[in-house]
Amino acid sequence: MRKKIEIYDTTLRDGNQGEGVNLSLADKLDITAALDDMGVDFIEGGWPGSNPKDIEYFQAVKDVELRTARISAFGSTHRANIDPADDFFLTKLVEAGADVTCIFGKAWDLHVDEALRVTGDTNLDMIAEIGRAHV
């Protein structure tokens, strides 16, 4: 039985965070086309709502004809004490209209305690609520 390996590329988001790296919208669209030409399955375009360039990218990439790649939007769980349906960043993920959405949730106790300032159970509830509100 043959298994297919699918490639999920994060160059446009994670790669853009490198020191001295500042991809323009045109750069991101050119890289998208090149990754698609190479047969990459998923291209993570950025974090809609985190900056104007990523919002522009998700609008502009809709006009790019891709052969195989599916565009993914990246984001996090909603903020504590905010209904997921009312969370700005989750709303921007939905509005981006990407083929795929990649949502991360904090897993390390230190991050849950110090960054989110919620209990572990509350954090798990926040992660579960995303599916109920937006999937």
Identify what each model region corresponds to:
Residues 8-27, 73-84, 112-124:
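Active-site mouth loops of central-metabolism enzymes
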Residues 8-9, 98-107, 127:
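Non-cysteine beta-strand/loop elements that form the S-adenosyl-L-methionine
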Residues 23-34, 85-92:
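Short, acidic/polar
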Residues 32, 55-62, 87-90, 124-131:
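Generic structural signal for well-ordered alpha-helices
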Residues 40-65, 73-82, 103-118:
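Glycine-rich, proline-tolerant flexible connector loops at the mouths of alpha/beta enzymes
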Residues 133-135:
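Conserved small/polar residues in nucleotide/adenosyl-binding loops
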